[in-house]
């Protein structure tokens, strides 16, 4: 995320989202009644051509809308914000509806009553754009699962079988093994960032040696770590271990996974945790909240009613973490009601 300009007297921040992660961050920052300004396409009638029966022509215009619906479309790499027009050229009626498609590299101005957690999220997005992206390959000698680590979740890129079999002779198995390595490398060769190979056995080490010999351009980006499991279980193990943080700096998804692990541990021993809105509100009555945890879905549904609690947490120097439901840790928090807290001290 690039922050272009801040205009405090108007509560406006001009910014440019650079990738899908930034669009996800924006989907959690923009809320109903915020004003959004951007260059967008709008179909307008050609009043000078009365004979044409079509719906007019599309042209680019600078519009402002008051947000009503905010929809993040991962598959289409866009954030759609719909609402009534509040600023437009003279030939476009104020009060009519329009949808602004926010895509990477589109400059957007957001006008709202900026909260500390909104600004913290913008800073996170700005910082994350400077960090290397990470692909994780969880593998052994028979299968490899390839994942892209994003700010808001994990995308499975490929699952590759090795073809190595006890029914084949040594030469055939060697051919199958190198074909397996080649398929893995073809799946990641265009990726710009760090590549983490992990899993049980020596498969990860063998492919590292193969890359060092055959693909020297990729070799500097390769990191190898141990894991006891393959597949998604191995990925979960890696996320909980903190290994991603060593590569990435501090990966948001890794941080979220670790803090939910801590929450579940505290809940299991009836320790420093509260979950569900009633329990969390009770903890706030004692000023006991250290970290308030919300799923992005819960915040979007309840933002107007939950902001007082969020303000109260910040007033006692507590922290707030909004967790994506696109990965397992967020789904675990959702199962707890979508809202929980880590506490400073136990309460009855």
Curated annotation (Swiss-Prot):
GO CC terms of this entry: cytoplasm
Molecular functions (GO terms): endonuclease activity; metal ion binding
Gene3D superfamilies tied to this protein: 3.30.1330.30, eRF1 domain 2, Pelota, domain A
EC number annotated for this UniProt entry: 3.1.-.-
Gene Ontology BP annotations: nonfunctional rRNA decay; nuclear-transcribed mRNA catabolic process, no-go decay; nuclear-transcribed mRNA catabolic process, non-stop decay; ribosome disassembly; RNA surveillance
Keywords carried by this UniProt record: Cytoplasm, Endonuclease, Hydrolase, Metal-binding, Nuclease
Main location: cytoplasm
Cofactor: a divalent metal cation
Compartments where found: Cytoplasm
Family annotation (InterPro entries): eFR1_2_sf, eRF1_1_Pelota, eRF1_2, eRF1_3, Pelota/DOM34_N, Pelota_arc, Ribosomal_eL30-like_sf, Transl-rel_pelota
Superkingdom of the organism of origin: Archaea
Pfam families xref list: eRF1_1, eRF1_2, eRF1_3
SMART domains membership: eRF1_1
Binding partners and assembly: Monomer.
Biological role stated in the UniProt entry: May function in recognizing stalled ribosomes, interact with stem-loop structures in stalled mRNA molecules, and effect endonucleolytic cleavage of the mRNA. May play a role in the release non-functional ribosomes and degradation of damaged mRNAs. Has endoribonuclease activity.
Domain statement: The N-terminal domain has the RNA-binding Sm fold. It harbors the endoribonuclease activity.
Xref: HAMAP family: PelO (MF_01853)
Homology family: Belongs to the eukaryotic release factor 1 family. Pelota subfamily.
Name the record gives this protein: Protein pelota homolog
Organism encoding this protein: Methanococcus maripaludis (strain C7 / ATCC BAA-1331)
């Amino acid at each position: 995320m690039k922050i272009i300009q801040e205009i405090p007297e108007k509560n406006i921040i001009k910014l440019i989202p650079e990738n899908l992660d930034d669009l996800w961050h924006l989907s959690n920052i923009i809320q109903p009644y915020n004003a959004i300004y951007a260059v967008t396409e709008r179909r307008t009638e050609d009043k000078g051509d009365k004979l044409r029966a079509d719906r007019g022509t599309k042209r680019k215009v600078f519009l402002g809308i008051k947000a009503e619906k905010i929809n993040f479309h991962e598959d289409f790499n866009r954030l759609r914000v719909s609402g009534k027009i509040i600023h437009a050229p003279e030939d476009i009626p104020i009060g009519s509806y329009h949808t602004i498609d926010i895509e990477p590299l589109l400059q957007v101005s957001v006008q709202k009553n900026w909260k500390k957690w909104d600004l913290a999220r913008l800073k996170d997005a700005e910082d994350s754009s400077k960090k290397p992206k990470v692909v994780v390959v969880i593998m052994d000698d028979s299968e490899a699962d390839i994942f892209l680590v994003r700010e808001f979740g994990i995308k499975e890129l490929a699952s590759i079988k090795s073809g190595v079999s006890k029914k084949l002779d040594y030469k055939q198995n060697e051919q199958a093994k190198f074909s397996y390595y080649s398929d893995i490398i073809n799946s990641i060769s265009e990726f710009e960032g760090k590549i983490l190979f992990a899993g049980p056995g020596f498969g990860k080490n063998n492919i590292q040696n193969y890359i060092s010999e055959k693909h020297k351009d990729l070799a500097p980006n390769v990191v190898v770590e141990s894991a006891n499991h393959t597949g998604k279980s191995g990925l979960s193990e890696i996320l909980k271990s903190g290994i991603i943080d060593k590569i990435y700096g501090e990966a948001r998804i890794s941080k979220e996974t670790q803090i939910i692990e801590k929450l579940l541990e505290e809940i299991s021993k009836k320790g420093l945790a509260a979950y569900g809105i009633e329990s969390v509100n009770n903890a706030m009555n004692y000023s006991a909240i250290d970290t308030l945890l919300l799923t992005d879905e819960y915040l979007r549904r309840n933002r107007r009613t939950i902001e007082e609690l969020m303000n109260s947490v910040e007033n006692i120097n507590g922290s707030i973490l909004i967790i994506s439901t696109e990965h397992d840790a967020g789904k675990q928090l959702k199962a707890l009601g979508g809202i929980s807290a880590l506490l400073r001290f136990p309460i009855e």
